[in-house]
């Protein structure tokens, strides 16, 4: 089965892990500091805090910004953690509709702020599939209204916006190191920023809110958590980061093949990456035309049966029963239609062009047999 995304683990990773496992200290040691340093250098920021998941990273980012009882404006087209973490931090969430590239619509965000900008604790955006949001425009809005900006760049480590790495322009940016993401530490995440005070706060909360005083003595100055990432995981992350650019090139090769082969086909559209952006290609979404919406489940099952691992990104967060109970029925037209249309097909560094051709041929072969027709 060709999965939609896949980790890259080679002998160099195994060697790095083996060496780390033989060290005296397995957690809370120098590898944590080293991983944070190389991550800062790669992204081009001053400070980083690595954690045991991107969800933990989001939770502490929201908490550090002091958003309790305030509103977080965010996208519905994301893994639920983007909104969940805000709720856990004591905020309310409000969803802003998306554009046809899956990213939050900065014009609709601006309209919401023009309507009422009071009690907004943060704007939290997601670089869908590894393709940057319009971060300059959104950052300008955040500064205009004096609202903190979080860039949930979980998909986008290594992506570029106007020749700069994604993760530099928000007050706090989040990366994920889950196995399907650009690099992996098994599970893991990070917050990066040029704001030392915010990162110091997050580092304090990462480890129970405890500070060392002298010898055996310490003090707990805040109610914190155990969100630490082990030295063993960090050793893997350090080695993974060395391979990232090469792996992104391989992903881009597969995506470029798809872009060319899928041009002007009668079944679906693809997301066009603007020339001032470079996506990490975490996902390769196809967007079925409306006459195929009702056949999506049939197509999904047929592709799996044929050995093409597909996934859907994402069910809008407000469609989960928990959020329906919390917020009531919400309908955002673009997010709803994107969910009806979207399928993520295999695109990762473990593939070659022969694999990509197999995906293309299989996809078209199945679509040719699908009986199109509008729902209802």
Language model features with spans:
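N-terminal "arm"/small-domain region of PLP-dependent enzymes with the aminotransferase-like
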Residues: 1-25, 30, 346
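PLP-dependent aminotransferase class I/II
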Residues: 33-38, 42-49, 107-110, 122-126, ...
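Anion (oxyanion) recognition and catalysis
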Residues: 87, 139, 143, 304
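Hydrophobic/aromatic ligand-binding patch that stacks against planar heteroaromatic rings
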Residues: 84-86, 141, 182, 232
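Phosphate-binding glycine-rich loop
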Residues: 25, 29-71, 85-88, 95, ...
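Active-site phosphate-binding strand-loop segment of PLP-dependent enzymes
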Residues: 101-185, 190-192, 196-197
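Conserved PLP-anchoring active-site segment centered on the Schiff-base-forming lysine
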Residues: 59-115
